[in-house]
Amino acid sequence: MHNKLNEIKKNESPPKVIKNLFSKDEINKFLSLYEQLPTTIHNKKQNVIKKRWLKEYGKELEELFYNRLKNEIGEFKYDNLKTESGDIIFGLFQESYNPIGLHIDGGFNFEDLIYKQSLIPLTPVGSTVIFKNRFYGKSTNFTIDKNELEKTKLNYGQNIRSNKHIGMFGNKPFNKEDHQKFLMHEKINDLLGLEIELVYEWELG
């Protein structure tokens, strides 16, 4: 668990959807930045492309992003990953045509003070499911798949695999209607004890 768990809990708040944070022109600039960035991962099997926001690209956009977010959540510091040469990464762009599995973005260092997570959709197609339940470990992909759980030799910046969420939040079966509507890509038994807090249907801006 994180060393600053009490401080993390004090900073917790319900999910908040901020509309019109960025203009249409600014969104187009982010899309242009995405096209310029080199591809980090292209998983053709899962149809996912990931690109790191390297510091050599879009410095003005980074300042814009930081200041807009600071106006909403107050002063903060990025939980930056680094490149192979030790340079910081501003963030991660992800282009996916399939749903992303159950996970948390809890950072990779228990010394860090996790504050807020931000998600900026660059397309109006898609949604994000946020749960009421809280898990205070490092960045983790949750699964009951034995093959996934055996993956322990992970690269820098990859989420660990875990099934520790099973039973952690009780044994109440997951809502079948919610499963069919939002989470058919997950095995319902993998959602044991979980409860949805918000389903955010993406909007530009």
List the model feature ranges, each with a label.
Residues 1-89, 97-99, 143-171:
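Non-heme Fe(II)/2-oxoglutarate
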Residues 78-80, 86-87, 185-189, 205:
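Intrinsically disordered, low-complexity segments enriched in polar/charged residues with Gly/Pro
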Residues 94-204:
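Catalytic core of non-heme Fe(II) oxygenases with the double-stranded beta-helix
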